Amino acid sequence: MFRSNTIRNTHHRPQEGRLPVRAWLSVVAGAFLALAHMPASGAETDPRLAGSRAAISSFGAELKAALSEGMAKGGPPAAIAVCQEAAPAIAAAQSAELGAQVGRTSRRFRNPVNAPSPAEQVALEAFEDRLRSGESAANMEHWRVGADGSAIYLRPIVIAPVCLACHGEVLAPETKAAIDRLYADDRATGYREGQLRGAFRVVWPAR
């Protein structure tokens, strides 16, 4: 049996319009670092919850910096190439430091390594249902502890306007070429603004 907590918070992301490349850094920061700290019943007594939040904050900051550098150098195609190398390396370093698996997951993944487990898929579907009902993603977290002491933390990632350059329904030819070159099994295009892209995740081993 598992006990599952949905954690709500009051951290709100700013409304974003269509932005020039110069404003890309701040938008990515908001998309990657919108984390919550309000307690759910019993959840805050587990130090792994705070560890999960901190690890994702650090992961998001490092990934944001790498993507921003790529975007500044060569727009979306360069950012895609940088992310393909940087994201796994950053996740591996965070995982080693935390003692848990840090990364991202999505039902429509770009990298198959990020495919969700059955439990994660259920949580992602719940996030999607809540978004469709009008709830803000800023209010959502998922914390699930197994009978064996393992745990899963998820935090949703939602498509913002700037994300559409690499994940939208219409891509620039050079962007599509970069995706096709680096991701043979890409499933992460065709999104519209406001849809669930996936989630940050931390998976803790059994105790």
Where are these regions (language model features)?
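Bacterial N-terminal signal peptides that target proteins for export
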Residues: 5-28
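Conserved long hydrophobic alpha-helices within structured protein cores
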Residues: 28, 169-170, 174
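The canonical Cys-X-X-Cys-His
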Residues: 160-170
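Sec/Tat signal peptide C-region and signal peptidase I cleavage site
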Residues: 38-42
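Extracytoplasmic c-type cytochrome modules immediately beyond a signal peptide or single-pass transmembrane anchor
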Residues: 43-159, 174-207
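Bacterial N-terminal signal peptides
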Residues: 26-36
